[in-house]
């Protein structure tokens, strides 16, 4: 009965874990993140460590905490320990998506979706890199799936795990960690007949609650970094969204998002093309809501990506996962 789940776990681990330390850091982004964890361990400053004697981190600390904690166990910060959090995040997201769709469709389709997710180029690449994107994606996707489960159960109780996932996402890369999950579920709930003001207040409240833990770090970092920290936060968040950064960072046109989406899902983009000429698959009533959630998620994510003047390929990983589930 549990063989498909065991297969997903084993395949994910075998595809990722043995290979993380085989190559040196090969982009400027990887050592930039790893050195933050190294500075934390060397200086003992876990709030706002100074890197190379002059720089403060460009991103919130959750990803760096993960690297530092893993490196404490091995005794050093190296390529393997720096990439391990991304790999574990991808494994967790793959397993989580499998369990989610197995309960709402069947084991065969859930297994297919999990393997498509794990082997798509952009997702797999992020899972073996020392960058914040994979941990951010896992937290955002986790929040969406948990919010959906909460909605599915009649919106009863409090979705604590979903809120904690958003907190982790905010502590990984900033406000996008709560904006995207709440916006997606807000759109989905309205599509499913939810009342506008009630839905808006509900997800607005969840967004505020998800900021409690990140606020503790932001306040502590502000006390330590002062105006320089505030200027950096403004540029990395507001400046990045409005295209007013003092330097160009991954600035691309709107069509670039779709080009990245198609190449990032390689080699499975061919399946999407071939499916255009096949007969529509029958949908069961049990999966109608899940399909609607995927559609709302993909559309909302595309909107958020187009509004970001410096959208990264890593920001499209959530859409890759949801689009391949729709293809199934």
Each language-model region and where it sits:
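Membrane-integral, polyisoprenol-dependent glycosyltransferases
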Residues: 1-293, 299-328
